A protein has these predicted regions:
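ATP-binding/phosphotransfer module of carbohydrate and carboxylate kinases, centering on a glycine-rich
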Residues: 1-45, 49-51, 75-76, 95-101, ...
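Phosphate-binding/catalytic loop of phosphoryl-transfer enzymes
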Residues: 61-165, 311-315
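Conserved helix-loop-beta element of the AMP-binding
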Residues: 53-55
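Solvent-exposed beta-strand sheet faces enriched in polar/charged residues
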Residues: 57, 86, 241-245
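Alpha-helical substrate-recognition element adjacent to the catalytic core
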Residues: 29, 57-62
Length: 315
């Protein structure tokens, strides 16, 4: 991307891309994506930087110690002159509003929130699951909770639920116990629990009470997280945007969205919910233009070009 907002190349490279502490950093995958997008722009990725500024909005950049660690790792590759690191939640927020501040909530495999006040103050959360006090932690939690509800319905510890049938059917087995055993013996990758999130929404749409309870629990955690950021930044009496991004928000469950809207508006009546309809990479690119003090016309051009430019060479 040039400073005037022209898109010089775009790529979606599907690979493990979480920089969580304790995992091997996926620098090679990131480097491959940079190499491919640079090639589209006619730039050779070698020992020389390919751009003046690199704005990296990365999953796993959750704590200040993560910011320092990942920045060192990325700087070591000499891809760009100036490395600017943000959590991926900031890309969601920037892609969804041009105010320059507000609240961004991402709910995909996990749940996280970042908020920026009109004075530039920032609130963010560790988003480390139970370790950081999180309760209903995104789509991964919803999938695991669905399996738990199915098991409890079967053995009598909980109410009967259509998940008793729908969960095993999704994995082409007869009983939820078979799913549990496959997870226990590592025959089934635990990441596949994410596949159950849409199943829960489908069951709730069909009137399943237990599925609706789980969805409400997730909505309430989203509300609690967003409202905590709103209160800490003293936004309760202001007008601002709350941007909702991530796979969980790409559903057609009106009750889920309404519950979140009502819960946040009870604390901040001037908050407007905006479901993100642009790729989060738009937010990262706009943050880069913000850092370069680009003109508004450049940012408008970037939005328009990325809206009509497919992410090439998808894998």
């Amino acid at each position: 991307m040039s400073v005037d907002g022209a898109v010089l190349g775009s790529v979606r490279h599907r690979a493990y891309a979480n920089f969580n502490f304790g995992h091997e950093p996926p620098l090679d995958s990131l480097g491959e994506a940079i190499r491919r997008v640079a090639a589209q722009a006619g730039i050779t990725l070698d020992s020389q930087p390919v751009a003046k500024v690199g704005l990296f909005c990365l999953a796993g950049a959750d704590l200040p110690l993560d910011d320092r660690r990942i920045t060192r790792q990325v700087k070591g590759r000499s891809w760009v002159d100036d490395v600017m690191l943000r959590n991926d939640t900031f890309a969601i927020l920037r892609a969804g509003t041009d105010r320059g501040w507000g609240v961004g909530v991402v709910c995909g495999s996990g749940l996280n929130c970042a908020a920026v006040g009109p004075d530039g103050r920032i609130v963010r959360f560790p988003a480390l699951g139970e370790l950081s006090g999180d309760l209903a932690h995104g789509g991964g939690w919803l999938g695991r909770a669905a399996l738990g509800a199915a098991l409890r319905g079967r053995d009598g510890r909980g109410p009967h639920t259509s998940l008793e049938k729908m969960v095993p059917e999704h994995f082409k087995v007869k009983r939820p116990e078979s799913v549990m055993e496959a997870l226990y013996t590592l025959e089934l990758d635990s990441q596949r629990m994410l596949e159950l999130a849409p199943i829960v929404f489908k069951a709730a749409a069909g009137g399943d009470v237990e599925s609706r309870r789980l969805i409400d629990e997730l909505a309430d955690e989203i509300i609690a997280t967003a409202n905590a950021a709103i209160r800490r930044l003293r936004l309760t009496r202001l007008t601002f945007d709350v941007v909702l991004g991530g796979g969980i928000f790409r559903n057609h469950d009106g009750a889920f969205t309404a519950r979140i809207r009502d819960g946040i508006n009870a604390v901040a009546p001037g908050a407007t919910m905006r479901r993100l309809d642009a790729p989060p990479v738009v937010g990262a690119a706009l943050l880069g233009l913000d850092a370069l003090k680009a003109k508004p016309a450049a940012k408008e051009r970037l939005r328009k070009e990325l809206a009509k430019t497919p992410l090439a060479s998808r894998r």
